[in-house]
């Protein structure tokens, strides 16, 4: 997935989404083989080199990885994928806790990268497929409620150019935030 000595889990998550789209368009079974092999590699290596080992991106965006693991599980039924999903979730930013206000990021200016927040909206709902906890399923809706009072904008997005900041009508939000939020929805 990466050339040379560049090691990071996050770019591989992007490649997994591309492989999924390719499979959905073509039905090419090689994708299933490649993803299965990669996920076995992840299961073997994540305990020693967690999602935040090389950069923080993997930890914040682990929901994208989890999404691809569950997608493959729904095709193959391979039990090791559920174990991997549990591991990925445990190494991912605790979005459900954040979205229920158990931490202060949603009430603190400059507390996180705005695009990471957009990525995070999908993780509790993806995890809900395994947890079946209504708190996970309802976490994104609760986050939006909190954010309307802090850095939310009338557009439904939130204020942020790199870092989130309190809503100011003269400042907008990144295009990448809008794109990732659409993907999360």
Which role does the model predict for each range below?
Residues 1-185:
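Glycan-recognition and catalytic cores of secretory/periplasmic carbohydrate-active enzymes
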């Amino acid at each position: 997935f990466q050339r040379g000595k560049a090691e990071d889990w996050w770019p591989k998550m992007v490649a997994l989404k591309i492989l999924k789209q390719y499979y959905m368009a073509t039905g090419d079974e090689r994708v299933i083989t490649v993803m299965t092999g990669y996920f076995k590699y992840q299961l073997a290596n994540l305990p020693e080199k967690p999602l935040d080992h090389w950069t923080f991106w993997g930890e914040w965006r682990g929901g994208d990885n989890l999404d691809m693991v569950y997608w493959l599980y729904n095709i193959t039924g391979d039990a090791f994928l559920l174990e991997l999903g549990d591991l990925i979730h445990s190494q991912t930013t605790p979005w459900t806790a954040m979205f229920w206000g158990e931490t202060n990021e949603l009430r603190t200016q400059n507390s996180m990268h705005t695009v990471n927040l957009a990525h995070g909206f999908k993780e509790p709902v993806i995890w809900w497929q395994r947890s079946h906890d209504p708190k996970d399923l309802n976490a994104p809706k609760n986050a939006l409620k909190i954010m309307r009072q802090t850095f939310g904008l009338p557009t439904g997005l939130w204020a942020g150019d790199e870092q989130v900041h309190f809503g100011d009508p003269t400042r907008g939000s990144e295009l990448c935030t809008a794109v990732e939020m659409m993907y999360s929805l």
